[in-house]
């Protein structure tokens, strides 16, 4: 891949509205040719999706997914701008794929890292700062190590940061962005709930010998 200058990245960003990293990748893939880079971004659905990201997405649909065996279920709200798009195959396919993603990711609790409450972040920092492997390290180094670990942990909790189950070379955020570009509307995952059969129910454990004895005495 060719080296990419900051000036070219800025020019492409101004022209397309795409993110800095997306512009850098597009230019690297096209040997610094801005015209081809624009086409590359459009093919990936990135250029148009970025410009639409600030528009209101008040329509959409709530999808459900029940995993094989009916032990895991998901409800997920996916928003777009028009009811017409919400009924389309591309949108419905995305709704189904993201719902399946939630079912496959038991550790995911939030749509994005921006949704994670500060008290959860503070708790994770406290846990990491107290780990034995940091003993004896300078404070500045501790902070740097913890920041790296926290960043990784927060991404594990974020749906949009997960590798897409059908194509691990892209994230769920990339998938949503790509479909939004193809649809031509702003598309956002608003919220979801994941259900696991029996979750939170305490099962009384009975010793087998005690159970037999109680049956004998009755």
UniProtKB/Swiss-Prot annotation:
Lineage top rank: taxon: Bacteria
Keyword Transmembrane helix appears in the UniProt entry: no
Keywords: Cytoplasm, Elongation factor, Protein biosynthesis
InterPro entries, A to Z: EF-Ts_dimer_sf, Transl_elong_EFTs/EF1B, Transl_elong_EFTs/EF1B_dimer, Transl_elong_Ts_CS, UBA-like_sf
Subcellular location, record wording: Cytoplasm
Range of residues in the leader sequence: none
GO MF term set: translation elongation factor activity
Cross-referenced PROSITE patterns: EF_TS_1, EF_TS_2
Family matches, as Pfam families: EF_TS
Keyword Cytoplasm included in the entry's annotation: yes
Region ranges (Involved in Mg(2+) ion dislocation from EF-Tu): 82-85
One cellular-component annotation, GO: cytoplasm
Family stated for the protein in its record: Belongs to the EF-Ts family.
Biological function: Associates with the EF-Tu.GDP complex and induces the exchange of GDP to GTP. It remains bound to the aminoacyl-tRNA.EF-Tu.GTP complex up to the GTP hydrolysis stage on the ribosome.
NCBIfam families for the chain: tsf (TIGR00116)
Protein name: Elongation factor Ts
Organism: Synechococcus sp. (strain CC9311)
Organism phylogeny: Bacteria, Bacillati, Cyanobacteriota, Cyanophyceae, Synechococcales
Gene: tsf
